[in-house]
Every structure is written in structure tokens, then in C-alpha cells.
């Protein structure tokens, strides 16, 4: 999810995408990437970082040209999720997703409610690795494209990296 800033009281959602994975992080399905139309006034008043970043990626122009509304995209994503997952059955997963949820509560409440109340936040593992095993944290290479789909794919790769190099797990029990 990309927004015009970090404050859901004054900023808005401008791009969303979604990927469904299984518990082993294999991609099962991928939604369309939606640029959500927002007013020129809102886009013209983004802070310097968002103006530069979303301008560089072309997202600002895509948002200006889009006819998608938040409500329309919310319904499309609900339809997409319901093909794969029953309501309230899966946590939201990604990087710093508490921020995404804050915006969803305000602008896409039905979608936010479709997720389980728990989160699987890759940022938690990143912060733990920084504190407990800094070389592991430094070994993660982030491109930081700030495009919704790219960021999701990068979060999945980051989670795979932490699973392989940071989390210790017992071998799966053999079927008897």
C-alpha cells in the first residue's frame, strides 16, 4: 500500500496490491495493482519525500489518471481475497503493516475487517535481527521501490531470508 503521507487523518491511499501465499511463502495468487484516484489538491500538497518518490515512480501521474475509487478497490480486493481465504482467517502480512491497517480502518474498513486481528509484520523480525544478530539484518538487500506490488514481493523475500538465516526451526516431522 502506498499513501500520500503517514497520517490517515489528512493523507490518503494511492496504490494497493495484494498477494496470497501459503504458509511456506509460495505465491498462490496476485491481485491487480490499483492506483486510486485522489484530487490534484491532495497530490499537490504531499510532503517533499512523497512528492519526489511517487513522482519518480510515475505513481502520482497514474493516480491523477485513475478512475478507481477507494470503495471500488476495496470491493475488488474483498472479492479477490474471498476466492482464497475465508473472512477473519488470515493475518495481514508485510512490512510496517500497522500503518496500512490505520489507513484501512479509515478508508477501507470492510477490507481491514476481513483480515484476522493478528499481524505478521516482517518489520518485527528486522528490528529483532538488528538487535540480536546485526549481520543478518545487514544481509537483507532492499530495493525500496515504493510500488505496492514490488514492496509486497520484497517483503516475501525478506521473510524467506529471515526464515532461512534467523529463525531456528525443528525439522518437519516425518509422516508415519
Swiss-Prot record:
Gene3D superfamilies reported in the protein's UniProt record: Ribonuclease H-like superfamily/Ribonuclease H (3.30.420.10)
Pfam families named among the record's database cross-references: RNase_T (PF00929)
Location(s) in or outside the cell: Cytoplasm
Domain Exonuclease: 2-159
The enzyme's E.C. designation: 3.1.15.-
Keywords: Cytoplasm, Exonuclease, Hydrolase, Nuclease
GO BP field: DNA metabolic process
InterPro entries for this protein: Exonuclease_RNaseT/DNA_pol3, Oligoribonuclease, RNaseH-like_sf, RNaseH_sf
Residues forming the catalytic site: 117
GO cellular component: cytoplasm
MF annotations from Gene Ontology: 3'-5'-RNA exonuclease activity; nucleic acid binding
Family named by the database record: Belongs to the oligoribonuclease family.
Alphabetized PANTHER family for the sequence: OLIGORIBONUCLEASE, MITOCHONDRIAL
NCBIfam families in the record: PRK05359.1
Main function: 3'-to-5' exoribonuclease specific for small oligoribonucleotides.
The protein's name in its UniProt record: Oligoribonuclease
Organism: Neisseria gonorrhoeae (strain ATCC 700825 / FA 1090)
Amino acid at each position: 500500500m502506498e499513501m500520500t503521507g503517514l497520517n490517515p487523518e489528512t493523507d490518503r491511499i494511492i496504490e494497493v496490491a495484494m498477494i496470497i501465499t501459503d504458509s511456506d511463502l509460495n505465491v498462490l495468487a496476485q491481485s491487480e495493482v490499483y492506483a486510486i484516484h485522489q484530487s490534484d489538491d491532495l497530490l499537490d500538497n504531499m510532503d517533499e519525500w512523497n512528492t519526489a518518490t511517487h513522482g519518480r515512480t510515475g505513481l502520482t501521474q497514474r493516480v491523477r489518471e485513475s478512475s478507481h475509487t477507494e470503495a471500488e478497490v476495496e470491493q475488488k480486493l474483498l472479492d479477490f481475497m474471498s476466492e482464497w481465504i475465508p473472512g477473519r482467517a488470515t493475518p495481514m502480512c508485510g512490512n510496517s503493516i500497522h500503518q496500512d491497517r490505520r489507513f484501512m480502518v479509515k478508508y477501507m474498513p470492510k477490507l481491514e475487517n476481513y483480515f484476522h486481528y493478528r499481524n505478521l509484520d516482517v518489520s518485527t523480525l528486522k528490528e529483532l535481527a538488528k538487535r540480536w544478530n546485526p549481520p543478518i539484518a545487514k544481509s537483507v538487500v532492499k530495493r525500496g521501490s515504493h510500488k505496492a506490488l514490488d514492496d509486497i514481493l520484497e517483503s516475501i523475500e525478506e521473510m524467506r531470508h529471515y526464515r532461512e538465516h534467523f529463525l531456528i526451526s525443528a525439522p518437519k516431522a516425518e509422516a508415519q
